[in-house]
Structures are given as structure tokens and as C-alpha cells.
Amino acid sequence: MKVCFETFGCRLNKAEALQMEADYLAKGWERTERHADADLFVVRGCSVTARAQNECRKLIDHLRHKYPRAQLRICGCIDKKSLKVSTPQALKPANSQTLKLSNSQTVPTRTARAYLKVQDGCAGSCTFCIVPKFRGKSRSEDFTSLLDRARQFIDAGYHEIVVTGCNLSLYASQDKRLPDLISALAGLDAGCRIRLGSVEPGACALETIQAMSEHANVCRFLHLTAQSGSDRILKAMKRPYSAKKIEQSVLLAAKLMPGLGLGCDLMTGFPGETNLDHTATCGLLKRLPFNLAHIFPFSERPGTPAATFGGSVGKDVRSVRAHELSSLIHAKRHAFAKSFLGTTVEVLVEDEKSGRGWTGEYLACKPILGTFTRKSLVRMTVTKIESDTLLGRPCK
């Protein structure tokens, strides 16, 4: 029996899909990427934006009509009602996001890095976000169990573990919080990198940044869920921080870990966003040493407060503002990549054929010569930059 996995959305969705895939393989299933060969499709969806939801719905409709004999299993952050499936029996939720986190002991081995899901759900009430509808209240995986799981990943040959969750800043178990977890994971094996997923600006972020700086094997990359540089818009979004808090987190990270990769999420065209608000976001991006950004035009999600707000910003304006932010970050990312010329970087090899991989700062890097094993960590001296990709010579 063959199973085909189709996954949309964030790292958390990917982590859950990889774990489910490993569980299926352990039970004797064979993975396939060819739709025509599949006996079962597992679609892990995403409804965070209308675009993601539409892409997911189109795929599900296509699979249902072209391969009616195959089973279809739908899970993840997807609005089942929006699918308009005429045969309800085709909808088989693979796991409820309101249950406890998975206790599977099967270790996924297909990817170059391991994904450690430490938390699920969210206690926030952001006016634009539909995720709590699917993932429920915040709950955290047991601290000791996570360390045991990380050891399994290390024993399986992984040299990078990505810490992921719905809202990492809410992690709490056995009187331990995210900074404690990062320190404990980093202490397991100096030869295994720890990469942190997105965190909210604020007190937890400041403590986590301090913990990151104390361990050389924690990747020098921080991604903040900023969303906007305007306090007025952040308040309307019900984000639990101000632009000042964003700046504090960024400046502390840059001070304690010079040269780190700094990313953020930014949204354009939130209801009521004026040119002045957008200018504040542009100013934040220019002023602070961000070198990566995920930029999204606002997408109305049915059932969220923001979907009913007045002051709607036209979709063309949302796109223009998103393009402006993208242009700003593109120039900053290129300058960031150029700053590594002549330096030595550590690369986790993802593609065995080309040797391409990623530095701890989340820059793509390719060797000029040599062959390398997937999942291995290789040190390279950067000799050239091509389209923000580092080219390097392996160190002897």
C-alpha cells in the first residue's frame, strides 16, 4: 500500500506531516510522490490565508475527482466547511489538534534536519488570526520527554534540530520555559545545532536571546513575529507587544550575537492601515538589522474580528505596500550575504548531489568542489556570492 503526503503551510505543519509519514512507514506503508500510485492521500492543509486555503481546496478537489478509488485523509489547519466536499465520508481527520501532543517514538529520517514539536495551540486573541480555531488552547510537551526525543534525533544521525510550535513563547513544562529548553537542548551534544522557530517580541524573547548567546551550537538566527511597525496597528491586531519591544529584542540579539540572521513576519494592508502606519513599518525594517522577512498582504479570514473591521485597504494597495517592503528586505539580504565574503561558515548539507545547504544564519551555501553526505556539517570559506547564495571552498 502506498501513501502520498501533501503538506501546506508552516514548519509546524511540516513537522507533524513528517512524524505522521514516519508512523505510516513503520506500519508497512510505502511513500510515493506519484499521485497515480497512491492508495491513500494525506493532505495537511492551511487556512491562514485565503490563498493557501484555495490552493489546498483545489488539490483536494483534484484528488477526489481524478483518483476516486484512493482514500483521502485531511488534517492540519484547514476549514473543513470551506472544502464543500459532497461525500463527507472522504473527510477523515487524521488527528485532533485539541488532543495531547503525539507520543510516537518513530523517528522521521527523510529530511536533513529534525523537527522537534514542543508546543501546540495559542492563548492569544489576535484579531486577524484563525489558527486558534483549529489548534485550540496552548499546551506544551513534557520537558523531559523532549530531551529524550532530541537524543533520539541525535542518535539517528541528525546534526540540526529545529524547535517548532504554534507559539513558542508560550512553552511551559515542569517550571521550565523556552529559554530553559533551548539551553538544555544545546547541552545534549555540542555537535548538533539547535535552530529556533519564530518567537514573539517581549520578555520571553529577551530571555531566549540571552540563552541562545550562551551556546555556540545554537544557530545564529532569530525570527520575530513582528507584523507591523505601527503601534496603532499592533494594538488593533491585539498583538501583545509594541514596536519598542520589537526593537529591544532585535538590538539585544544584535549586541549579544553580532552577525546573526534576523527575520520577521510583516503584514501589509491591515484594516485601517494608513500611509503613515505603512511608513512606520518601512522605518522599522530600514532602522533595524533585519535581513529576512516573510511579507503577507492582509487576508480576511471568516470568523475573525478583523474580517468585520471598517477601513478596508484595497488589495492593490496591500500588494504595492508588500512589494515596497520586499524591495527593502531584498537589498538588506544581499548586503548581509556579501558580509560573509572571506569568512568561514558552517553548513548543514541538504542536497547530496550539489552539496547545497544552509548556514546557521540561514543563508544558502554551495561548495565549489567536493562531495558531501546529506545531514553532515561542513565548514566552508566563502569565496563568492551569487544571488544571495554563498559559494565556498571546503576547509581541510
What are these language model-derived features?
Residues 111-144:
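Canonical Radical SAM [4Fe-4S] cluster-binding loop centered on the CxxxCxxC motif
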Residues 256, 275-276, 280-322:
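C-terminal, non-catalytic macromolecule-binding modules
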Residues 10, 171-190, 300-331:
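Radical SAM enzyme [4Fe-4S]-AdoMet core and its adjacent flexible, acidic
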